[in-house]
């Protein structure tokens, strides 16, 4: 069962010091946190240090923020949340970055 808050804290403790103004962070996942603590403070900290933070979500937008999905909370601290379910959507996201 996903626990993004725990995963973010572990990542931050191991690699947070490596994030800098030239860093782009890509977060990949459905943001379904199984009602655990969100750990969104980590994304906020990453965003303050990084050049960009983006979230790529494999679920259809119509599923976002339903049930245990907290993509809206996480997205608050990113430069954008994008539906990314296939190569076409991934390509469109990459083109936006170029």
Where do the model's predicted regions map?
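DG-centered beta-turn motif at the end of beta-strands
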Residues: 23-34, 79
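Charged helix-capping and loop-helix junction motifs
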Residues: 38-44
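Catalytic P-loop NTPase motifs of RecA-like helicase/translocase cores
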Residues: 34-35, 62
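Short, local alpha-helical segments
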Residues: 27-28, 39, 52-56
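Von Willebrand factor
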Residues: 1-23, 59-60, 65-66
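Extracytoplasmic/secreted cell-surface and envelope-processing proteins
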Residues: 35-37, 92-93
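Von Willebrand factor type A / integrin I
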Residues: 44-98
